[in-house]
Amino acid sequence: MQVKDQLSSLQPYKPGKSPEQMKEVYGDHSFVKLASNENPFGCSPRVLDELQKSWLDHALYPDGGATTLRQTIANKLHVKMEQVLCGSGLDEVIQMISRAVLKAGDNIVTAGATFPQYRHHAIIEGCEVKEVALNNGVYDLDEISSVVDNDTKIVWICNPNNPTGTYVNDRKLTQFIEGISENTLIVIDEAYYEYVTAKDFPETLPLLEKHKNILVLRTFSKAYGLASFRVGYAVGHEELIEKLNVVRLPFNVSSLAQKAATIAFGDDEFIEEIVRVNTEGLRQYESFCKENEIPFYQSQTNFIFLPVENGGEIYEACAHAGFIIRPFPNGVRITVGTREQNEGVISVLQQHFENKKRKSRDEANA
């Protein structure tokens, strides 16, 4: 049996290892998962309370158009319901966009170190992928603009960026958008939008009034703590959303997920508290890194990236101490946890870097 030739160069997405998988390698003790940027505090208590009180007929299909959820999102964001598209997580939304827009001979442009699903789905559709290196961990929009051509159908911008946690500011993004043809779709993935505290972070939704070629993505998997429910959404021009709905699978968001997301979206106090605690957690890591002269990227997300050469060693040290983090070829990404969890990881990092310094001194004196 034959499949698309382009699939031969791809591998299935590999998520962070689960505690169960870690036990098979590192022994049967408890693990704290800090690899997938999930909310360590879970979701709003309102969600749990309301779901326990409500009754859903599990024999019936969900609302295929996610009408109540889309209207709730639209009301809060001050857009029309027809401008909102819901998917089973942003992974499905990215797949829908790629399937609807791309064809063989087209190309996409994005960063070299960013969310891998942009590249993954472009290759499946037979497209060229133009990847531009980050500039000190940040999207280089000037360089991206220089490689966009007439065959560029999508520019993907992850803002804040995963895995570095960095962001493109309002001035740079607006300037970039002004220089891109209306024939090229600019997708701005704001999965970590709720965590942002930077004053010059761009507010992208008002840009939709002027630019029909902008699509903004957000999710309930991160700050809202609903990763297991799989709900993400896109906001864009009505005509584009209508076309994307053509490739959307019927009944793609479950009834339970729609209800949970609708409830969660109304609990602003919960999100405010999550952002406050997350900001404190980031300061824990930043203070430690500054005191010990360990490189890190200033993060606007719920994780921190350390661009170090020995990421594999750090991963192993954390794993043996019961912490699951995410290794990369050029560093490690650590999800911000509870204060106690952060202290635990920092203790491991402290010991690791002290051991490396001691080893370097011993080698120099040998």
Curated annotation (Swiss-Prot):
EC nos: 2.6.1.9
PROSITE patterns for this protein: AA_TRANSFER_CLASS_2
Region feature (Disordered): 1-21
Keywords (A to Z) from UniProt: Amino-acid biosynthesis, Aminotransferase, Histidine biosynthesis, Pyridoxal phosphate, Transferase
EC class: transferase
GO molecular function list: histidinol-phosphate transaminase activity; pyridoxal phosphate binding
Protein name (Swiss-Prot/TrEMBL): Histidinol-phosphate aminotransferase 2
Organism from which the protein derives: Bacillus anthracis
Lineage: Bacteria, Bacillati, Bacillota, Bacilli, Bacillales
